[in-house]
Amino acid sequence: MPSLDKRLSLTRREVEERRRARPLAQLEREVAALAPIRPFTESIGGEEISFVQRVKEADGALLELAEELEVAAVAAALGPLAEMAADNALPMLLTDMVVDPYQLYECRLAGAGAVLLVAAAFEDDHERLAELYSVAGSVDLDVIVEVAHEDELEEALELLDPDSFLLRNRGSDDDGSVDFERTFSLLEEVPAGKTVFSQGGVREREQVAALERSGVDAVILGPWAAAGDLAETLRQLRGESR
């Protein structure tokens, strides 16, 4: 996977290309004409942990199945989100790296109800992070702030005090390894009343149960779950009998 700096640089270039083809003022007018959208996080929670399914491409049959299986929401990049918007009844989360307000207008026009803001991407630019958070709220987008360390959590709480956080279950070296203990440790510092999402390495019922006991509200499942037998995967993760 490319480094964070390379991802940020590539994203900025791509956004500039799209902005030249379709000016921000045009997007602002189109967003202003949209009807209000149901808050994304209203789909999360309840008595049991929720599941959000990441998808790589628009797939009507998969979306119908996900809805039947009571998946809380779907998550995808901008392209698939825009393609599936017309035929999808589930709330949608943008998974793209967001670095520019322009993307928030694109996201809202694609039908999504929430975006991820990665705290590490704004380590040296808290002003831009605050700007993105504010603009997202102005266009009816919920914001989920991804934090990987306690200092990022503290800074996000001080700067934004967001309603939702994403905690990735990854090792301290960010080498692709999975470590749930980092998530459990961070959860102890998340104030009560926040909505917490977990992502990475969740494939067993015992892992889901441990996350739920620790205060996680929703698990974001990777595309692997949708590529196989989604019904069976969810049955196992929920601990349901056949």
Regions found by a protein language model. Name each.
Residues S177-F180, S185-L187, T195-S198, E204-R205:
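Active-site-adjacent loop and "lid" segments of alpha/beta metabolic enzymes
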Residues I144-V145:
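P-loop NTP-binding/switch modules centered on Walker-like glycine-rich loops
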Residues Q53, E57-L141, E150-E155, S164-L166, ...:
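N-terminal active-site wall of soluble small-molecule enzyme domains
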Residues L78, A119, N169, G200-G201, ...:
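Short secondary-structure boundary segments
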Residues M92, V99-G111, H149-D161, A192-L221:
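Catalytic cores of alpha/beta
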Residues D100, E123, S172-D174, A226-G228:
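Short gly/pro/ser/thr-enriched loop/turn and capping motifs at secondary-structure boundaries
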